[in-house]
Amino acid sequence: MHYITPDLCDAYPDLIQVVEPMFSNFGGRDSFGGQIVTVKCFEDNSLVKEQVELDGKGKGKVLVVDGGGSLRCALLGDMLAEKAARSGWEGMLIYGCIRDVDVIAQTDLGVQALASHPKKTEKRGIGDLNVLVTFGGVTFRPGEYLYADNNGVIISPSPLTMPE
C-alpha cells in the first residue's frame, strides 16, 4: 500500500498527530504504514534483533525504536533490515542511527531514522518491548498506527485508509 501523509492529514485532521520533522528516509519503500510495535533501548539493539527474527511477526506492523536519539552507534544494519523484510515488517522508525545505508535503500522495507553511523551497538539484552515511547513531540502507543513517507511521519489511534 502506498501512503501519502499530506492526504491523510487532510482527510483525518482530528485523528492524526504529526511527528516533529527530524527523520530521513533510508529504506527501499517510499512510504509505509501499519500497527505500532515499540522497542525502547539505548545503544543496544538486542530487542530489535529479537523482533525482526520472529517469522511473520511483523506482518502489517511498524517497529518504532526509541533509541534515545543517540548518534553514537547504529541500531539497524543491512542484515537486520533484510530479516525484517523477510518477516513481513512494513517499516521501522528509529529514533537513532542506522548503517549499511546503500543496502538498506535496496531492501523492501520502509526505514526512517535520524542519521547514519558506521559503528554497531553493544548486545547486552537491555531494553523494553511494547511500552509507551515519546519522542518527536508525540507518544507512540503499541497497537496504534503509524504512516510515513518523504513528507513526514504521522500517528493515529486507528487504521486510516487513503482517500479517493
Curated annotation (Swiss-Prot):
<dbReference type="GO" id="GO:0047443">
    <property type="term" value="F:4-hydroxy-4-methyl-2-oxoglutarate aldolase activity"/>
</dbReference>
<dbReference type="GO" id="GO:0008428">
    <property type="term" value="F:ribonuclease inhibitor activity"/>
</dbReference>
<comment type="subunit">
    <text>Homotrimer.</text>
</comment>
<dbReference type="GO" id="GO:0051252">
    <property type="term" value="P:regulation of RNA metabolic process"/>
</dbReference>
<dbReference type="GO" id="GO:0008948">
    <property type="term" value="F:oxaloacetate decarboxylase activity"/>
</dbReference>
<feature type="binding site">
    <location>
        <position position="99"/>
    </location>
    <ligand>
        <name>substrate</name>
    </ligand>
</feature>
<protein>
    <recommendedName>
        <fullName>Putative 4-hydroxy-4-methyl-2-oxoglutarate aldolase</fullName>
        <ecNumber>4.1.3.17</ecNumber>
        <ecNumber>4.1.1.112</ecNumber>
    </recommendedName>
</protein>
<feature type="binding site">
    <location>
        <position position="100"/>
    </location>
    <ligand>
        <name>a divalent metal cation</name>
    </ligand>
</feature>
<comment type="similarity">
    <text>Belongs to the class II aldolase/RraA-like family.</text>
</comment>
<dbReference type="InterPro" id="IPR010203">
    <property type="entry name" value="RraA"/>
</dbReference>
<dbReference type="Pfam" id="PF03737">
    <property type="entry name" value="RraA-like"/>
</dbReference>
<feature type="binding site">
    <location>
        <begin position="77"/>
        <end position="80"/>
    </location>
    <ligand>
        <name>substrate</name>
    </ligand>
</feature>
<dbReference type="InterPro" id="IPR036704">
    <property type="entry name" value="RraA/RraA-like_sf"/>
</dbReference>
<keyword id="KW-0456">Lyase</keyword>
<dbReference type="InterPro" id="IPR005493">
    <property type="entry name" value="RraA/RraA-like"/>
</dbReference>
<keyword id="KW-0479">Metal-binding</keyword>
<dbReference type="GO" id="GO:0046872">
    <property type="term" value="F:metal ion binding"/>
</dbReference>
<comment type="function">
    <text>Catalyzes the aldol cleavage of 4-hydroxy-4-methyl-2-oxoglutarate (HMG) into 2 molecules of pyruvate. Also contains a secondary oxaloacetate (OAA) decarboxylase activity due to the common pyruvate enolate transition state formed following C-C bond cleavage in the retro-aldol and decarboxylation reactions.</text>
</comment>
